[in-house]
Amino acid sequence: MGFKRYVEIGRVALVNYGEDHGKLVVIVDVVDQNRALVDAPDMERIQMNFKRLSLTDIVIDINRVPKKKALIEAMEKADVKNKWEKSSWGRKLIVQKRRANLNDFDRFKIMLAKIKKAGVVRQELAKLKKEITA
């Protein structure tokens, strides 16, 4: 199995750190071996170092350095947001954000639910063991 996420025009990437942390951006041009020109509907087009980007599996069909309107249309046509939210990586980040926003009482309720679930699983396992040995 080879590497499939290449730096290419139209590749959607996730920003790892910095002021745009967590945003999905599209590579619209490659400046040199270390930097790319990236753009997104809710931000200005900027140069970004490849070390700040994590390439995703999503690729949209765009020309080199498209206008903002063309980029937005291409992203909507490719359904980038839904593809990202349905991917395991996107779901994991959504869960992390949701957990980070929990307050103490919410964490307490989750702890009680986990204890209750573990108790039910333990009871069912004991029933199955009893059936096997009987």
Curated annotation (Swiss-Prot):
Tree of life domain: Eukaryota
Position of the signal peptide: none
Pfam families: Ribosomal_L14e
Single GO MF annotation: mRNA binding
Entry keyword annotation includes Ribosomal protein: yes
A GO CC term attached to the entry: cytosolic ribosome
Xref: SUPFAM superfamilies: Translation proteins SH3-like domain
InterPro entries: Rib_uL2_dom2, Ribosomal_eL14, Ribosomal_eL14_dom, Translation_prot_SH3-like_sf
GO BP term, pick one: translation
Keywords of the record: Ribonucleoprotein, Ribosomal protein
UniProt record similarity statement: Belongs to the eukaryotic ribosomal protein eL14 family.
Designated name of the protein: Large ribosomal subunit protein eL14y
Organism for this UniProt entry: Arabidopsis thaliana
